[in-house]
């Protein structure tokens, strides 16, 4: 019997190293993060050296720009707020085995919905107007992702494909709206009308871009963590993601869990879009997402869909981006190089986090074409 | 059975002081094993006792950390399987290594094809496999497609393959797991014939009845060490079990139960399904299970038993027929509703369906309690203190050996994993329990424990449907037994009025009697 019962760990499920709570794992993860950062640092030194600058002082200037004083910290965080929400959203879907790579599209849908609610409703009491904008965004994202989740649950339409393709449909449709019927006639480029003032978060630290939305973001991250890791709902979602056959045989509503987790994921991504509109941009324009949805997917993968790890990685990512902007200012190291650097670091992190194994699992899923 | 071989000079094969560790785990420690020419030597032990590791060391798949291997008195070192093949060692794996779409000749010669320049010389191959085939009494056209043959014949092809490669030492890993009792007997005749012709056979098994039927000597491993080696004639099953488990009180006979059989709890009428994965479709299956009763479902794997279990719990839809539980029709209901109405289920594939293999013990135990919690309470904490205390209490009560409720299920042994499943299912206090292969890959001590819990459940009035490929299990536990063949109930009998041989006949579909439910 001995050979037959040794099934490989997690033949199904995307994030197979889940449910780990043993001691020693935290240190492994820290070591892994440390490795990644060292690789990144070495790469940075090399790239800056190649441009003929003194690497360490240049880097120090970048780090100074990112986290050197309270103002810069606030600025760095403010830039990252939508990413925190979107990354938590993506992680929640991953945890229940739904590979929601449609985050970018859901962010656009949410941004559009909140921009419209902000521009065409009101002015009214600020709190109510903001709530309306955020709810509209959540509804748009949730509806979009939920529909794709339903397709997967009911018809076996693979969500990897459907969410990926939905990005193009949604982003291009929003671009059509912003350049066509809903275009702000007073502007040249493709934007919608500016939201009224009651649909904007007030800055809490002057000239940092850090607004009151930070409280909402903290609350949403806490909610996402609770939902996914602590609640009964999260238990069902995680079981559905890790061991779908077990969940099915145990009487857990697998289809319902898949749809519900996609709804939650889409709602959070939609809210990330609303954060972009109501806390910084003030309107929808055709490039508003600037790849935050893709960043969210990457960060959630590196964080292996654990909410806390994902949030930590979002923070690291934000600091890196800000530092790269800082480096760009003090040297002629172009921003393209900082993007290369970030990509390399992500690859190193991904290698450590077993992301490639996860991609192999996806490929396997496609080759077998067995929609469960 | 033949006379024990204790004389002879130098053994054909001698493993001495074999030690193999995997990280902190010692799989083999100072293991000694030898094999005489013309001998059938059984290697027995529980799961994880180190049988497979030892054989993989012998077959060159693992390198031992310490110890020596002698073949014909010559010390050898096997770095890969081809090394050991060169010394005449052949392995018949539990899972056949045959290409179903290849012909018999292609499969047998695969990896050592006659002919030159990469071309397959059909004639030479047909010629070359003739001799080993006739040694086994296999009479098949060499161009038969392997996939069309039945399991027992495929197994013979596997053995032919080993003989074709010139093996003098044949390792058989759990060869009877896939066979009916009759096919098992045939295999034993064949093995005896091979041994009489001078081949030596290492027979790995945990089924004692078979070991005693075929082996000349028995070596018992426990926890990676050799516990005993004795001639079959000089020992008995009780001693061997004691050596395997380290306990003297393991029951091997019929499980004692005091349960009064009462009203019908589960009634299946004419249920049919579509074909599902590798299993046969159900075709009008009808039966009842009464309160306090254990009904066994016997049959060669792939005759619809797995589908039956899944159709009853609700993961496979019916195409016809009805299922009643306690007088209530549950045909159209989902798994959750069926479970709420008192149905419990121990699935066949423990790692996929029984437990969340990468989840924690507590997550595996609590599925029944968390499944049905509704509405706003689902937003609450899944594992508050009370739940964790409940989990710890279950771990205690079902003596699940684990560092704690938050240990990963995958780190537990098969027996302890199965205890998680049984604990969860029995804690729901079911009126009907479906057991699918409940003791597969479970060690003898844990089997004893699980049977005890099942007997207690029937004493409380639980109706049990026991689906098992292990006839001994069915004969030890059940009151009635149904035999499935090609998706139908081929026979039904009271356990006290039937025999292993009779059931075996029905399992092969030899004689289809009138079905009565």
Where are these regions (language model features)?
Chain B
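Glycine-rich phosphate-binding loops of nucleotide-dependent enzymes
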Residues: 2-517
């Amino acid at each position: 019997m001995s050979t037959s019962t040794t099934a490989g760990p997690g033949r199904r499920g995307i994030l197979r190293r889940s449910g780990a709570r043993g001691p020693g794992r935290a240190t492994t993860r820290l070591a892994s993060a440390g490795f990644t950062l060292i690789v990144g640092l070495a790469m940075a030194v090399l790239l800056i050296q190649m441009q003929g600058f003194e690497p360490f002082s240049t880097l120090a200037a970048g780090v100074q720009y990112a986290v050197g004083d309270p103002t810069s910290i606030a600025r760095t965080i403010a830039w990252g707020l939508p990413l925190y929400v979107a990354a938590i959203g993506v992680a929640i879907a991953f945890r229940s085995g739904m590979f929601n790579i449609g985050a970018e599209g859901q962010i656009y849908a949410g941004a559009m919905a909140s921009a419209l609610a902000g521009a065409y409703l009101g002015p009214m009491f600020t709190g109510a107007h903001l709530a309306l904008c955020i709810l509209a965004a959540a509804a748009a994202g949730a509806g979009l992702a939920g529909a794709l989740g339903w397709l997967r649950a009911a018809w076996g339409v693979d969500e990897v494909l459907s969410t990926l393709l939905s990005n193009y449909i949604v982003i291009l449709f929003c671009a059509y709206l912003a350049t066509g019927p809903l275009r702000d006639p007073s502007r040249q480029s493709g934007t919608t009308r500016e939201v009224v003032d009651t649909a904007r978060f007030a800055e809490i630290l002057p000239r940092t871009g850090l607004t009151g939305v930070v409280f909402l973001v903290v609350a949403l991250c806490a909610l996402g963590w609770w939902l996914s890791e602590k609640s009964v709902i999260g238990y069902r979602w995680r079981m559905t993601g890790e061991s779908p056959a077990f969940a099915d045989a145990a009487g857990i509503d697998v289809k319902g869990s898949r749809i519900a987790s996609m709804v939650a994921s889409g709602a959070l991504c939609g809210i990330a879009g609303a954060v972009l509109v109501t806390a910084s941009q003030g309107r929808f324009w055709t490039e508003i997402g600037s790849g935050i949805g893709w960043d969210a997917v990457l960060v959630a993968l590196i964080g292996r869909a654990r909410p806390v790890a994902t949030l930590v990685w979002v923070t690291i990512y934000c600091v890196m981006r800000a530092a790269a902007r800082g480096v760009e200012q003090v040297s002629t190291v172009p921003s393209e190089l900082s993007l290369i650097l970030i990509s390399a670091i992500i690859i190193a992190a991904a290698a450590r986090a077993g992301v490639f194994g996860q991609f192999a699992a996806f490929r396997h899923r496609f080759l077998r074409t067995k929609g469960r | 059975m033949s006379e024990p071989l204790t004389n002879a000079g130098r053994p054909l094969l001698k493993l001495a002081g074999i030690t193999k560790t995997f990280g902190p785990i010692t799989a083999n420690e100072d293991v000694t094993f030898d094999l005489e020419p013309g001998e059938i030597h059984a290697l027995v032990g529980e799961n994880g006792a180190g049988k497979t590791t030892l054989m993989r060391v012998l077959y060159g798949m693992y390198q031992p950390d310490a110890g020596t291997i002698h073949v014909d008195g010559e010390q050898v070192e096997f770095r890969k399987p081809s090394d050991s093949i060169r010394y005449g060692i052949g392995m018949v794996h539990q899972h056949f290594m045959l290409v179903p779409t290849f012909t018999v000749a292609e499969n047998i010669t695969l990896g050592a094809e006659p002919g030159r320049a990469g071309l397959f010389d059909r004639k030479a191959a047909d010629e070359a496999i003739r001799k080993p085939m006739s040694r086994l009494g296999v009479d098949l056209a060499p161009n038969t497609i392997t996939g069309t043959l039945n399991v027992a014949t495929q197994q013979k092809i596997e053995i032919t393959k080993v003989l074709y490669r010139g093996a003098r030492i044949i390792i058989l890993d759990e060869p009877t797991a896939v066979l009916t009792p009759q096919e098992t007997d045939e295999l034993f005749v064949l093995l005896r014939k091979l041994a009489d012709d001078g081949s030596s056979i290492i027979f790995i098994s945990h089924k004692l009845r078979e070991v005693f039927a075929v082996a000349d000597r028995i070596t018992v491993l426990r926890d990676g060490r050799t516990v005993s080696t004795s001639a079959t004639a000089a020992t008995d099953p009780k001693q061997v079990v004691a050596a395997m488990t380290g306990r003297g009180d393991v029951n091997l006979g019929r499980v004692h139960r005091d349960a009064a059989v009462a009203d019908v709890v589960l009634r299946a009428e004419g249920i049919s399904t579509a074909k599902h994965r590798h299993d046969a479709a159900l075709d009008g299956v009808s039966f009842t299970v009464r309160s306090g009763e254990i009904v066994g479902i016997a049959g060669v794997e792939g005759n619809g038993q797995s589908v039956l279990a899944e159709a009853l719990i609700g993961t496979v839809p019916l195409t016809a027929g009805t299922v009643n539980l306690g007088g209530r029709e549950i045909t159209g209901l989902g798994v959750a509703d069926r479970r709420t109405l008192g149905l419990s289920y121990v699935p066949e594939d423990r790692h996929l369906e029984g437990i969340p293999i990468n989840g924690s013990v507590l997550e595996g135990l609590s599925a029944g309690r968390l499944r049905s919690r509704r509405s706003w309470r689902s937003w609450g904490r899944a594992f508050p203190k009370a739940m964790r205390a409940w989990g710890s209490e279950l771990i205690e009560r079902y003596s699940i050996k684990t560092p704690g409720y938050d240990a990963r299920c995958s780190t537990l042994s098969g027996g302890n994993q199965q205890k998680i499943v049984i604990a969860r299912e029995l804690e729901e206090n079911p009126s009907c329990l479906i057991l699918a292969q409940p003791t597969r890959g479970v060690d003898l001590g844990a089997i004893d424990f699980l049977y005890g819990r099942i007997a207690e459940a029937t004493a409380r009035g639980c109706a049990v449907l026991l689906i098992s490929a292990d006839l001994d299990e069915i004969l030890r536990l059940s009151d009635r037994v149904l035999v499935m063949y090609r998706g139908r109930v081929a026979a039904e009998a009271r356990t006290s009025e039937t025999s292993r041989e009779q059931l075996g006949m029905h399992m092969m579909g030899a004689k289809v009697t009138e079905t009565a439910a």
